Amino acid sequence: MVRLRLPSATCLLGLTWATLALQSRGFGAFSVVKPGGIDDVLVTEDNTMTGTFHGNKTRVVHQHRNARRADDQAALTLELVNLYNAKQTINAYVTGLDGSNRVVFVRADGSMVYPSSGGSETPVLIKESVAIPLTNSSQRMPLPTALYGGRVWFAEGPLQFYMVKTPCGDGMVQPSVMNLRDPSAAINWSFAELTYTRERSVFANISYVDFVGLILSMALKQRNNRGTQSIRGLDTDAVTKICSGMIDQSDTDGFPWSRLCVADDTGTPIRVLSPNSYGTINPGDFGQYWDGYVDRVWEQYRQTPLVINTQSAAGQVECRVSPNNTLLCGGGDNRGYDKPSAHDIWGCNSGPFERLPDDNGVHVAVIPRLCAAFVRSTLLLSGGDVQPRLNASHYYRDASASHYSRLIHELELEGRGYAFPYDDVNPEGEADASGVVASGEPETLTVYVGVPPK
């Protein structure tokens, strides 16, 4: 790798001129990782998968071919393909909760590792071999168990996972993009999300809600000639291009968008954080970002109605800002909406967008549509008085917008892949913007890392 000094021709091997130019532009503008040790591991709700306690020792369960039931032939096959670099080994990991809610790793031979914290209330490194090394050929493997909240990870080096005792049992502490001191912080990695149910239905997606890292694509082949679903994701050099766009945006509006780019100690960007993830590190940097836009929205809909198409039995509901400065919606919506903060808009799950247990169906339907309208900054456009109505060509046009989401969708090869939690809110008749594949009759789920397949 090249540090920021005049490089020799030898040092340029493996680096593009675009990357070197970006290093120079981003010097001092990017967030920089400083990986630490086990004492720097943070245990948070965001990076801990909580399962039931199964014992004080790690267990390995091997699948014996002769002992499989006949119906196991219908189990899902997982195929992992390295298109990143034929000369470089990529480590894959398959994690999740099994049908009994226990943390599990699935290895290449179909064996399952059930790690244990041993009752430790401080994180304990998982030392068992759980990585699946990928060279220039694909790895096909059975998925012998239901997997809930699953992830298929890919990394340029070894990722470190930990176990810790929790009030509910045993929890797995996963690498965190929100901790610049995480032991795995300097490694370029990414994951696809996967749920495989006891009934053998599969739901998988490529998401950029938290960050953009290694580039992933996926395909789901279905049984009984039901065809193949595919998601091609982002272009290969998306991280470099997004970071270049972030620097430009910082120059335009003065907000530290470039800080969303996370670089290693050479200045090379390895991932881009979402505004919501970045807010965990530096909550004040975008604290007032949306204030002006929200004020303008509130003033407009104090005078004229905002219509939310719930796309449900409730149909369209009319909303208006009340004298006490709360947005109130009709149709039986059980409570109003206060002005959202930047934190509320980035995450779509706090403040006026938080779902409470007693919220009725109308309120639950309004939340995602209202938050999506803010993130995409469509509320003040002509035609934006009905949400959702405008198509994707109108998104992110206002100066106040999620430029993280904008750049992602500009670089997606097919325009699909979540860039924020409610990116699946679409006007009726418009293409699905989410990066989801799903089937009740799955045969093979293929996940690619690197160059998107044709």
PLM region spans:
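Fungal secretory targeting signals
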Residues: 1-33
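Extracellular low-complexity, O-glycosylation-prone Ser/Thr/Pro/Gly-rich "stalks"
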Residues: 22-454
